[in-house]
């Protein structure tokens, strides 16, 4: 299985959340794990916000960033280029997606493999992906 992880599925790999075990099982099961290059910046932003909100202590933030670095290093990364952002813009409009979610969906389209599964905790992104024919796994 090729697993495309959006940021909402990557963060539970490095911070204990309700979907952490689910995401870890899919990560371990995948023959190949893929995301878009900007997932790192988006993940760091999510970890920093968790720290600002008091959900992560400073040492826990440093550990989570270290783990995110390791996870990111194992990903096959899809590059953000002009074609991708233009496709994402169209998907944002057609599928009522936020910008980064549209970028994730446009990136997942580039995999072009029947065994690919999009993994996301975002209900709107999952809905749009299903409408477009993707196999989807959503952490509960």
Range-by-range predicted roles:
Residues 25, 64-71, 77, 125-139:
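Anionic, Ser/Thr-rich low-complexity intrinsically disordered regions
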Residues 39, 66-95, 102-106:
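Acidic catalytic patch
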Residues 2, 105-106, 110-140:
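Acidic, PIN/NYN-like endoribonuclease modules and their adjacent C-terminal/linker elements
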Residues 43:
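Entry/capping segment at the start of metal-dependent catalytic domains
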Residues 1, 30-33, 74-76, 112-117:
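Short active-site oxyanion
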Residues 1-39, 50-63:
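Short, well-structured N-terminal submotif of metal-dependent ribonuclease cores
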